Structures are given as C-alpha cells and as structure tokens.
C-alpha cells in the first residue's frame, strides 16, 4: 500500500516510521530544511530526536508529490497536522487539485475560532471527500517511535476507510480497533488534553493520588456529558479514545499537557512554559473552546472552568483547586 503522511511533527514522524515498516510511505512537511535533515540523517532531530527512522521511509517538501502518492488506487493519506493548521492544509490540498480518495487524520482538539471538530473542518473544506475518519487513542509519539505496544481506534462512517486504515496500521506492535463514532472519538481526544492540565496542577501542588483519581473520574464525566450533547455515544468515552487517552495524558510523564499543569503549579507563567516546551500543548489551545461550547450547551464542566481560570484569568492554581473543593455536595 502507498501511504502519504502530511505533517512531520513528532506524531506524524512516529506514524510514518511505523507505516514504512510495511508500506511504501512518504512523509511530507512544508519546511524544506526539516525535510533535508530527515533525508540526510533519517532522524527527526527537531521533533523526535534519538529515534532512528527506517531507510525505506521517503521524504518530500512538495505537497503535490505527496498528494499524488496518497491518491494512488491502493493508497491512504494521513493528515498529521495540528488542528490549528488543518484548515490551511485543506486549502493547500484543494489548490493543488489532488485530494486523495481515502483520508484519515490524527489531530486532536477543537478549532479555536470556530469551535469546530476536525471532521467538520474537513467536511467544510473538502466537501467532495467522503471516505475519511479519525485515528486516535492513548499514545505517545516517542513510544510508537520505539516500537512499543500501542492500541488505537479508527472511527469512520465509511467502511472502506476503516478497512484501509486497519490494513495500513495494524501490524508490529500497533493494534487497531474500528468504530463509527467520529464525534465521540474527537471529543474525547480534545477534552482529555484540558483535563490533563488539571491533573498536572494537582500533582504539582502535591495533592496526592486520591486527588488525581478524583480529577480523572470526574473529568471523564465532564467529557462524556459534552460528547453526548454533541452527538457522541456514551460508551465511546469508556474506551481507548476516552478513558484510555485520558489516563495516559493525565498521568504520563511524556504528556505535554500534564507538564503545563505541573509547571503552572510551580509558579511559572504560561508564556514561559510554552516557550520552553517547543511543542504544541493542545489543551491550552482548545480549553477556551471547550468551555465556550459547554456553556452554549448548558453543560456543567467545573474542572474545565477551573483550568481556564488558571490559564487565562490569573487565578492561582491552589485557589482554583480550593474552588473545586468548595462546590456543593451532590449525587454522583
């Protein structure tokens, strides 16, 4: 199978390396210098340093060439751009006059200004594209790059997209499950990043494992309420792309969103934290969108509200936690 991966960040690079072990894979990035480095060293020293990439993996800064590769009869196009760059990439794909027939994306979050999920952006920008879906689940790019075991879910209303994604990814240490709840999978992937900031704050304040467990459990309730209101199915949120992804992101030391929370608890400013990270922390980008959507739907999301207060309203992390503890008692 031919596979084109659009986006050479940490996740796109790790997935491309996995795919190249079995398929004719091409990794695209618009940054010619990044592509030149990949070609010379077979390592993404900028985003995934220390991970050797397969010799068979090919690289290109020409979007047209990448799209042509992913548009072959027996091919798949994987969009690994962040949500913030998804619409721009769709524009470029359309302008190139070559939209692959089968597309799966791996980005997580809501578009900041429109509050749209990725599948809604795809539908608006590539209306002729119908065989598409989302690949998501509990996964750190570095561990995938190291060929450690991982389980992901592809959700699509297209059986052909599900089957093609399964054929591309389900090998080696990667197990793929299939489903059709695109909304539920996308909401889980977006909200868990915000909740991971909350658990990072609690851990950074030394509040203990009991507090972490409470935040994860009550955070899952927030995620599920929002997801069901937007059209997802409740059972999706107890699966890999809901609870599974939340546990990993809220507790794993490789989690950028958890790191943001830890550093906020240590008294660092958000600007300093993001500057030092050097990578995207999607929870920061989409926290306000999640809260705005919840309020528009009249859905109570107190943990998300507390995170937004710390990130954007100058509320001290300890005061935000105290506010959660002062909430009225209620039935679970």
Swiss-Prot record:
InterPro entries named among the record's database cross-references: 6-PGluconate_DH-like_C_sf, 6PGD_dom2, G3P_DH_NAD-dep, G3P_DH_NAD-dep_C, G3P_DH_NAD-dep_N, NAD(P)-bd_dom_sf
Entry EC no(s): 1.1.1.94
A Pfam family the protein falls into: NAD_Gly3P_dh_N
Subcellular location: Cytoplasm
Keywords assigned: Cytoplasm, Lipid biosynthesis, Lipid metabolism, NAD, NADP, Nucleotide-binding, Oxidoreductase, Phospholipid biosynthesis, Phospholipid metabolism
PROSITE patterns hit by this protein: NAD_G3PDH
UniProt name for this protein: Glycerol-3-phosphate dehydrogenase [NAD(P)+]
């Amino acid at each position: 199978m031919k596979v084109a991966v659009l986006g050479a960040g940490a996740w796109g690079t790790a997935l491309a390396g996995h795919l190249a072990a079995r398929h004719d894979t091409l990794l695209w990035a618009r940054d010619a210098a990044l592509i030149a480095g990949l070609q010379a060293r077979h390592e993404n020293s900028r985003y995934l340093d220390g991970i050797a990439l397969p010799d068979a993996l090919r690289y290109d800064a020409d979007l047209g060439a990448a799209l042509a590769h992913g548009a072959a009869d027996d091919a798949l196009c994987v969009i690994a751009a962040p949500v913030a760059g998804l619409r721009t990439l769709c524009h470029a794909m359309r302008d190139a006059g070559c939209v692959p027939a089968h597309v799966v994306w791996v980005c997580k979050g809501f578009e900041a200004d429109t509050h749209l999920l990725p599948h809604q952006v795809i539908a608006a920008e590539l209306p002729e594209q119908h065989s598409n879906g989302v690949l998501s689940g509990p996964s750190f790019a570095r561990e995938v790059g190291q060929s450690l075991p991982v389980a992901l879910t592809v959700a699509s209303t297209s059986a052909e997209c599900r089957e093609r994604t399964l054929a591309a990814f389900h090998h080696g240490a990667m197990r793929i499950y299939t489903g059709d709840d695109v909304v539920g999978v996308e909401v889980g992937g977006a909200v868990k990043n915000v909740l991971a900031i909350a658990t990072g704050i609690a851990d950074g304040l030394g509040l203990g494992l009991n507090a972490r467990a409470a935040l994860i459990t009550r955070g899952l309730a927030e995620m599920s309420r929002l997801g069901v209101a937007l059209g997802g199915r409740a059972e999706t949120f107890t699966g890999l792309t809901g609870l599974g992804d939340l546990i990993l992101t809220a507790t794993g030391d490789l989690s950028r969103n958890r790191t943001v929370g830890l550093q906020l608890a240590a008294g660092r400013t958000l600007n300093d934290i993001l500057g030092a990270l050097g990578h995207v922390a999607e929870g920061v980008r989409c926290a306000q969108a999640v809260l705005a959507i919840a309020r528009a739907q009249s859905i109570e999301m107190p943990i998300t509200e507390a995170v937004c207060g710390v990130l954007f309203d100058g509320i001290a992390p300890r005061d935000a936690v105290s506010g959660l503890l002062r909430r009225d008692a209620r039935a679970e």
